[in-house]
Amino acid sequence: MIKKIAILTSGGDSPGMNNAIRAIIKTARLYDIETYLVYEGFLGLYNGWIKPSEGIDEDSYINKGGTFIFSARFVEFAQEKYRQVAKENLLKLGIEALVVIGGDGSYKGAQKLHEMGIKTIALPGTIDNDITSSDFTIGYDTALNTIVEAVDKIRDTASSHKRCIMVEVMGHGASDLALYSGMATGSEIIVSNDYKLSVEEMAKIVKKQFEKPNKRSVIITVSEFVFKDLQQVAKQIEELTNITTKAVVLAHIQRGGYPSARERINATILGKHAVLRLKQGQSGIALGLIKNQVAATPILEALAMPQTRKDLLERRTKSYNDINQA
């Protein structure tokens, strides 16, 4: 039976990670399993920055964003010699199992440790929602709400000055944040990696929108990486329409903030089940939520899945562009 479990968060932080950590600690305590915290992700695992969770008030982090055990990117972990040191650091403390919370890069690290004999469970922690072995990743719902709040405020000032404003959101190739924030805010144009429009096409729509009586604002929601220079695109739209057009890149504000209620619930469920699966002797699996049920997928299979639900997102983006422009 598992006696000791370590927890680490890796890659980009996301709201809800603290809730997952809390659930792991509490569920493990229920079964007399000791938990250890690995500080600063795989970098900390390599450097031996591992401490018992005893004395930590995990409840105090339930409403905090980010990750209280911190995160880091450590590309050297792809090399076996670094992973071997990390494994030895776990074994020296008698730690038999590890829960890794992060995105696809974190999943790759978790899989390698599983292959080296460490019992490993991966949980999807990223705002991008690009781990498709789960309907929702930890951090996505909060980021979506953050974007909606920001765009609502941007709409206020755009309406005051009769402007078009382009808003770039994160997603790292996945279009979920752009599409669903665009739906929620009534963005007149949604452009993503799954549904692209040219500058001329956008300008035509903007011009038509402002021909409506009393129309005061147009919001264009754009996924990151669609355009290399959003300021330049905004300038081109302004030149084609004679409508003042600004560009706003929301950037890292999307990764911060207190987790939403749904986030806390999802993260708690996944954290609890990570312990239960390890207790059952399972390893090398990624947990997620599919149709509100906990689903387990081998990490290798999860990594092989497309990072975007392209066909669905493309259809929905076109459909809701049509609706929002009506």
UniProtKB/Swiss-Prot annotation:
PROSITE patterns: PHOSPHOFRUCTOKINASE (PS00433)
Binding site for Mg(2+): D104
Localization per record: Cytoplasm
Positions with a binding annotation for ATP: G12, R73, F74, G103, D104, G105, S106
A Pfam entry, by short name: PFK
GO aspect biological process, one term: canonical glycolysis
Protein residues bound to substrate: T126, I127, D128, R163, M170, G171, H172, E224, K246, H252, I253, Q254, R255
Statement: the UniProt record of this protein carries the keyword Metal-binding: yes
Lineage top rank: taxon: Bacteria
Keyword Repeat: no
Family annotation (InterPro entries): ATP_PFK (IPR022953), ATP_PFK_prok-type (IPR012003), PFKA_ATP_prok (IPR012828), Phosphofructokinase_CS (IPR015912), Phosphofructokinase_dom (IPR000023), PKF_sf (IPR035966)
Single GO molecular function: ATP binding
Keywords associated with the record: Allosteric enzyme, ATP-binding, Cytoplasm, Glycolysis, Kinase, Magnesium, Metal-binding, Nucleotide-binding, Transferase
Gene Ontology cellular component list: 6-phosphofructokinase complex
Reaction(s) catalysed (UniProt annotation): beta-D-fructose 6-phosphate + ATP = beta-D-fructose 1,6-bisphosphate + ADP + H(+)
Residues annotated to bind ADP: R22, A23, I24, I25, K26, R155, G186, S187, E188, K212, K215, R216, S217
Entry EC number(s): 2.7.1.11
Cofactor: Mg(2+)
Catalytic site positions: D128
Family membership: Belongs to the phosphofructokinase type A (PFKA) family. ATP-dependent PFK group I subfamily. Prokaryotic clade 'B1' sub-subfamily.
Role noted for this protein: Catalyzes the phosphorylation of D-fructose 6-phosphate to fructose 1,6-bisphosphate by ATP, the first committing step of glycolysis.
PANTHER family noted in UniProt: ATP-DEPENDENT 6-PHOSPHOFRUCTOKINASE, PHOSPHOFRUCTOKINASE
Subunit record text: Homotetramer.
Record's protein name: ATP-dependent 6-phosphofructokinase
Organism for this UniProt entry: Mycoplasmopsis pulmonis (strain UAB CTIP) (Mycoplasma pulmonis)
Name of the encoding gene: pfkA
